[in-house]
């Protein structure tokens, strides 16, 4: 209901960020309007791939919207009632229909325009609902206490339900929203994907040490520790501003606290300490100076919903962030600490510790920047969305495949070539392939005709867990078949797995993995023979697509370095249904020489830090694999790295240490 530009507010920022660069061969046209009167028609190119056309609503439409608002005590409901009032703006509908007629993909960024345009959709068009919220829940929260709003809320729920049922693809901002949609409207989660909000992370470089010192001098704070908070005039932000001024600043007089944005109005009339700088709204240049000068950023919220976008701004600037649980809600956590989460009462101690520890600030700031680049940069989210549209459009036009074979790859082009020859030889032909290649150079075979559909993504984002989740996002087959780039599936691999899925109770399949050099110390064999149902290996694992989406993929805490993510996933998969072991779904995994850096015993033993997370999540099941594998008394370095992981991830392993540590092989 609003124009994209100027991109102020979360909704407009999402429209600009998400659609500005879907792909070199994808042109997006946004048809919008103004939710206020008196504006003119507008048509402009916002980026090479995004055009904005804004059609004003009529005077009659605005009068009807005002009447609707009066019926609900003056609350603005022009968006909620659009489907019932759109006929009053025929020019908007005409322009929308004109551009819809030539589109392959039609996206509704809210449910409001869907009902009046539903009849104009073509059967072959991909229909997408880009949900910025679960509107049925949000609007009920906003207006549910008003009896006079019942009719408005019925319209909202009816419109959103109709769009969700018609959509071929639903984009949700979070996994929690995805689950809410599935639960509320009884939807197939297989057609839903999480596409988060973000920021333009690459628009500013991370300041170096000299730049930070210069910025402090420019602001009159040379050599002083600076903590920064940014917030609009919104109740949770206002509470945070008062907490900083009344509590933190008084407890830490040597630290200067900068409060930026409309939340500063909450401090009007108060006498604040000298080390509090209430700055109000700043232009972008001055705001960047404070981001550069700060040593630490704060987000001490105690309430709120959704993701706090300011966290991404802080991390993109390379700032270490101290947040409460509410302040960090919904943000991905990997195996590297990208921000600190503390209770409100411990915020002061965390600030005091962080401003005096240059190395921790440097490491956390770098990790936060990397997190934003990997997951929350519009520059990467937009092409991801474009690939999603292409994958689901192909699914709609060509039909749903039985399998999507998912392959992460990193610097093994020759192995990848051998794997593809094995896929060419598969007896089962109803499959497509997704490769997420994190190598420095693209794979030479990416454009070859292999006899099956290949989606190839070359990405600078590193990490096997990230790669598998990225591939799972693009997977449109009913079953996702996981294997590795150095594996060699036998010709009957997919066919054998398909037979297992004939049972409706089967949600996944664990295939047999054989290796060579099984008893040679200079080699690391990879096999699950004799370990059925215990560890699981993504070298040969199948999962129903719906189950993968329901589980939100692999847990990224097992990344950096990646280890045990497949075990955790397999165990969670078993909670949804049966995951039998299939001898005939066979993959050969060549052993790796120990003299390479990636495969050395010292390098591999460091991965046992992830056992701490596995133990924390699945304490009873962990003990089964603990004893079956026997690393605790056979593998040098197990205990030292397990203990390191326990400290790193805050896991209490005292019972294991007391019972097993002294009788083990050693650390």
Identify what each model region corresponds to.
Residues 420-458:
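Acidic donor-binding segment of Leloir-type glycosyltransferases
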Residues 394-425:
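N-proximal low-complexity "stem/linker" segments adjacent to membrane-targeting elements
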